[in-house]
Amino acid sequence: MDTHAFKRSLHHSERYNRRGFGRAEEVAESLEQAYQSGLIGTIRDNGYKLSHGRLTVRLAEAFGFCWGVERAVAMAYETRKHYPAERLWITNEIIHNPSVNDHLREMDVQFIPVEQGVKDFSGVTSGDVVILPAFGATVQEMQLLNERGCHIVDTTCPWVSKVWTTVEKHKKHTITSIIHGKVKHEETLATSSFAGTYLVVLDMEEAQIVADYILGKGDRDAFMQRFSAACSPGFDPDRDLSRLGVANQTTMLKSETEEIGRLFERTMLSKYGPAELNDHFVAFNTICDATQERQDAMFSLVDEPLDLMVVIGGFNSSNTTHLQEIALSRGIRSFHIDTPDRLDAQANAIEHKPLNENLRLESNFLPAGPVTVGITSGASTPDRAVEEVIEKLMLLSES
């Protein structure tokens, strides 16, 4: 399928909108009440620091809603305002934040049901309005909705669209896209649908397996068993790993994406030599600015003397998980929560999700005496949620 031609055709359709409806002022008050925070503004103005009795809060200098998320949420609110009576769907969570998605449900936005990992579009009919979330949607989903006569409101983050353009260029030049991402993440599913030949690698460990195979150090059967669910149909590692381009899920850890890119550049240089390197490896630049800013701010924050860290964001949020990884890499006692409700100020307890584990309830969360708490949040977390966590910490520090 010529995905580029399909996108161009879709973008010219009268039933497609990716620019909003000019109703920003009409939804501004609702957005402010639901997501913004006066306290957070005050803390920003005070050098990202708050002192309250024995408690000191240090905020990361970049956190919370990124521009792409703000845009997607605002467009969703505008869509309901523009289509007050129409049946309104969304193909997935608008962003990885439970409170934001709950607000959409309260606005009678229906989420496409999922049965055994497969989306069921049978309830969507001609004339329905369907929102594509910030992560985007697969080209097959877009095609289905277009053919069904739906009105499509596309809130896909432009940084994600940039990655799609990158893998389409790879496809045009018969280059295999190595996608650094989580194979079942909505964004990676969408990106791979625009690619031609592709292989998804989760981390440096998997990237090294691919690099070793390119240099003749791997077993084909073992390789295919490892990556059978992470590659394009008909993928042949002996044929399809000779010309590579790297792309990424925009919320992955920036440093690891760059390291993976350097690994494959060295690998192709070793195999083909400097004279032929440009024929076998394509450099990339698909790292999201907002993701990079939040990770850089987190690295700066964990250099400060912190007693503990609270990371706020959806448990299925990739960018939030990577912020948690940064704290843990510095040996900081860190807690990942998805909503302020996880913190019980009366009992000094917190229900949190340790990395790669199930939820855990921890007592004696805030230690006695003077305590400095670092706080950051993922790109899908509104300031209001961060404010509520800080208010609970202030209350807890007084007890």
Swiss-Prot record:
Keywords: 4Fe-4S, Iron, Iron-sulfur, Isoprene biosynthesis, Metal-binding, Oxidoreductase. Dimethylallyl diphosphate binds at H96, H185, S317, S318, N319, S380. Pathway: Isoprenoid biosynthesis; dimethylallyl diphosphate biosynthesis; dimethylallyl diphosphate from (2E)-4-hydroxy-3-methylbutenyl diphosphate: step 1/1; Isoprenoid biosynthesis; isopentenyl diphosphate biosynthesis via DXP pathway; isopentenyl diphosphate from 1-deoxy-D-xylulose 5-phosphate: step 6/6. Binds 1 [4Fe-4S] cluster per subunit. The keyword Iron-sulfur applies. The gene is ispH. The keyword Zinc-finger does not apply. Its EC number is 1.17.7.4. InterPro entries: LytB/IspH. HAMAP family: IspH (MF_00191). It comes from Parasynechococcus marenigrum (strain WH8102). [4Fe-4S] cluster binds at C66, C157, C288. Its cofactor is [4Fe-4S] cluster. (2E)-4-hydroxy-3-methylbut-2-enyl diphosphate binds at H96, H185, T250, S317, S318, N319, S380. It catalyses: isopentenyl diphosphate + 2 oxidized [2Fe-2S]-[ferredoxin] + H2O = (2E)-4-hydroxy-3-methylbut-2-enyl diphosphate + 2 reduced [2Fe-2S]-[ferredoxin] + 2 H(+); dimethylallyl diphosphate + 2 oxidized [2Fe-2S]-[ferredoxin] + H2O = (2E)-4-hydroxy-3-methylbut-2-enyl diphosphate + 2 reduced [2Fe-2S]-[ferredoxin] + 2 H(+). One of its GO terms (molecular function) is 4-hydroxy-3-methylbut-2-enyl diphosphate reductase activity. Isopentenyl diphosphate binds at H96, H185, S317, S318, N319, S380. The active site is at E187 (proton donor). This is 4-hydroxy-3-methylbut-2-enyl diphosphate reductase. Belongs to the IspH family. It is an enzyme of class 1 (oxidoreductase). Catalyzes the conversion of 1-hydroxy-2-methyl-2-(E)-butenyl 4-diphosphate (HMBPP) into a mixture of isopentenyl diphosphate (IPP) and dimethylallyl diphosphate (DMAPP). Acts in the terminal step of the DOXP/MEP pathway for isoprenoid precursor biosynthesis. It comes from the Bacteria. GO terms for biological process: dimethylallyl diphosphate biosynthetic process; isopentenyl diphosphate biosynthetic process, methylerythritol 4-phosphate pathway; terpenoid biosynthetic process.
